[in-house]
Amino acid sequence: MAFRVPNSSLLSLILLSLLAIASAKVFFEERFEDGWDKRWVTSEWKKDENLAGEWNYTSGKWNGDPNDKGIQTSEDYRFYAISAEFPEFSNKDKTLVFQFSVKHEQKLDCGGGYIKLLSGDVDQKKFGGDTPYSIMFGPDICGYSTKKVHAILNYNNTNNLIKKDVPCETDQLTHVYTFIIRPDATYSILIDNLEKQTGSLYSDWDLLPAKKIKDPEAKKPEDWEDQEYIPDPEDKKPEGYDDIPKEITDPDAKKPEDWDDEEDGEWTAPTIPNPEYKGEWKPKKIKNPNFKGKWKAPLIDNPEFKDDPELYVYPNLKYVGIELWQVKSGTLFDNILITDEPEYAKQLAEETWGKQKDAEKAAFEELEKKLQEEESKEDPVDSDAEDDDNEAEDGEESDSESKPDSTEESAETEAEKHDEL
């Protein structure tokens, strides 16, 4: 009996991966199992205004494992703020991996699904939208224009948005978002364990002034040829070109039989555009033999640039917090992880989302099918239309009575929050 020997390089990779996972330092890991509520503090932010939303502990309306629960927003037009503390640490000389899963069950049209990492001392009971944070990461959806992953880094007390566009998932299933920051100031953003963006903290955020700038003293040389095409000096205008009329008498026009010259005046044939007329003559263009390209000022060292070898460092990370405003509730968070090992994060994602995603999708599709079947069993079209009219009238009254005054400003509030990000 023959045995196949594993490829040595593949075996080495597997061993390295196992060693990395075994040596991983986990700073925070929350799977929302028993006792989770003792680790998390719900903020009193917005409670005085009756705008603080309640969190539900649930696996959601559809899931891949009913025993795997997370926390879910439960009330529309509400603010949400909750946080957990962990032993303070610095990511100096370490890779920082921030990961969590999120599901929007509510067909989200405007709202966030991001989480924040906070530093220093925070009054968790007062944690809210004005609380300073170090990192904000996760999906954000609002209308047709905003469907992206936020990756905001605080540097010198300024929040800096990533300059690259990273599209987020927009369906109603669970997805895993991972943000990796390395000691060499590079980063990666993953969705469902697949890399969606990578680059440098130097180039993809405006954390520092540019290393190079255009020389303000440089001027384009007078003899610089930046026209790629020029008129052909050998091209000559054809003889008689300017004599060609723009319009000519319509050769097909005929004087009407009932035309009376004495009463109607002398008949004149109408004119039509002359097909021979080509407009103002211009010589044809040829490639400029002296073309040097578009002139650009040379780059020089920026005197205002000062490198920061610890650009990637957050020296006193201590809290993870979820702070949201949601017009429609139903966003569910789970499996929040902060570690120094990407392989451990990948393994956690596969153990949770990876094992459940197919069952969750099947459960969602089954529920959608049942809803469609129920809709098809409704009353005939005419009755439906009549009912819809009645419901619309009732709805207008009930909406005006049931919504708090603050909801009238909800669209403006949401727009303001997105403008601030």
From Swiss-Prot:
Disulfide bonds join C110-C142. Residues 196-261 are annotated as: 4 X approximate repeats. Glycans are attached at N56, N156. Keywords: Calcium, Chaperone, Disulfide bond, Endoplasmic reticulum, Glycoprotein, Lectin, Metal-binding, Repeat, Signal, Zinc. Residues 1-22 form the signal peptide. Residues 265-303 are annotated as: 3 X approximate repeats. GO terms for cellular component: endoplasmic reticulum lumen; endoplasmic reticulum membrane. One of its GO terms (biological process) is ERAD pathway. Its main location: endoplasmic reticulum. Residues 233-257, 350-380 have a biased composition (Basic and acidic residues). GO terms for molecular function: calcium ion binding; carbohydrate binding; unfolded protein binding. The keyword Cytoplasm does not apply. An alpha-D-glucoside binds at Y114, K116, Y133, D140, E323. The keyword Disulfide bond applies. Residues 217-283, 350-421 are annotated as: Disordered. InterPro entries: Calret/calnex, Calret/calnex_CS, Calreticulin, Calreticulin/calnexin_P_dom_sf, ConA-like_dom_sf. Sequence repeats lie at residues 196-207, 215-226, 232-243, 250-261, 265-275, 279-289, 293-303. A motif (Prevents secretion from ER) lies at residues 418-421. It is found in: Endoplasmic reticulum lumen. Residues 223-232, 381-399 have a biased composition (Acidic residues). Molecular calcium-binding chaperone promoting folding, oligomeric assembly and quality control in the ER via the calreticulin/calnexin cycle. This lectin may interact transiently with almost all of the monoglucosylated glycoproteins that are synthesized in the ER. Belongs to the calreticulin family. Can be divided into a N-terminal globular domain, a proline-rich P-domain forming an elongated arm-like structure and a C-terminal acidic domain. The P-domain binds one molecule of calcium with high affinity, whereas the acidic C-domain binds multiple calcium ions with low affinity. The interaction with glycans occurs through a binding site in the globular lectin domain. This is Calreticulin. It comes from Prunus armeniaca (Apricot).
